[in-house]
Amino acid sequence: ISVCDLPADRGQCTAYIPQWFFNKTTEDCEKFVYGGCQGNANRFETKDDCIANCGCNLPSKVGPCRVSARMWFHNPETEKCEVFIYGGCHGNANRFATETECQEVCDRYQKPGFCYQPSETGPCKGSFPRYYYDYEDGECKEFIYGGCEGNANNFETKESCENAC
């Protein structure tokens, strides 16, 4: 049984600790009060942690309403954040207002943040072959680095790029 299938469990103690759990019925992350001991693993400190663990692999869900809002969801098949049209009600936890928000939540356990930066030559005039991770294509590609500044998406070998991203 998956952590995400477990019910909210306050535990036996009487502390008042606001936490989040994934509600299998609503397919969303909801607040509950944890007592401080026992309970189960369907308990997260933040809503984003809950979504990252339980929501990002859900299919997009339009819902029955007809607002037609442009939203983003994490597509578990392509492992990318993609646009979908949300009806405005009864969706699920895999729904984000922006692509950046989707990436920050759903990719947090997959790739470091610098893997989403573009290649950056920098202001210097050198000509050093380097590799960067191209998030759109999901692969490491060669680019020319000028020798200074730039960003962290910059690797001397394709292998080191692939290991990092």
Curated annotation (Swiss-Prot):
PANTHER family, per the entry: BPTI_KUNITZ INHIBITOR DOMAIN-CONTAINING PROTEIN, KUNITZ-TYPE PROTEASE INHIBITOR-RELATED
Domain BPTI/Kunitz inhibitor residues, every copy: 4-54, 56-106, 115-165
Protein name per Swiss-Prot or TrEMBL: Carboxypeptidase inhibitor SmCI
Residues that carry a glycan: 23
GO cellular component, one term: extracellular space
Entry's Gene Ontology molecular function annotations: peptidase inhibitor activity; serine-type endopeptidase inhibitor activity
Post-translational modification: Contains 9 disulfide bonds.
Binding-site residues for a protein, renumbered to this chain: 1-2, 109-111, 113
Family matches, as Gene3D superfamilies: Pancreatic trypsin inhibitor Kunitz domain
CDD domains reported in the protein's UniProt record: Kunitz_SmCI_1-like (cd22601), Kunitz_SmCI_2-like (cd22602), Kunitz_SmCI_3-like (cd22603)
